[in-house]
């Protein structure tokens, strides 16, 4: 089970990503636009670098909603493989059951 501080850190990152998403998108559009002048592009790059590091979506880590486990995460369910198996065995996941052939 992940430390509660790790879960809190990920929640904080998610808030920052949501807060700065529009600003980051606008700056990236200015930077990637070929008609933008070099001065405007450089200003946009500096502003983008000035944003908080954790406001980048690439720094987020998918974690299990129950345990906070970062590995073996299944995006469709929001759970780690271990917790998904336990929930499946209890019959809590509709349409999912143990394979037998």
Swiss-Prot record:
Q: Which UniProt keywords apply?
A: Ribonucleoprotein, Ribosomal protein, RNA-binding, rRNA-binding
The Swiss-Prot or TrEMBL record annotates one GO molecular function as:
structural constituent of ribosome
**Listed HAMAP family:** Ribosomal_uS14_1
Function field? Binds 16S rRNA, required for the assembly of 30S particles and may also be responsible for determining the conformation of the 16S rRNA at the A site.
Protein family according to the UniProt entry: Belongs to the universal ribosomal protein uS14 family.
Question: What does the annotation say about its assembly with partners?
Answer: Part of the 30S ribosomal subunit. Contacts proteins S3 and S10.
Q: What is this protein called?
A: Small ribosomal subunit protein uS14
Species in which this protein is naturally found: Shewanella loihica (strain ATCC BAA-1088 / PV-4)
What are the top taxonomic ranks of the organism? Bacteria, Pseudomonadati, Pseudomonadota, Gammaproteobacteria, Alteromonadales
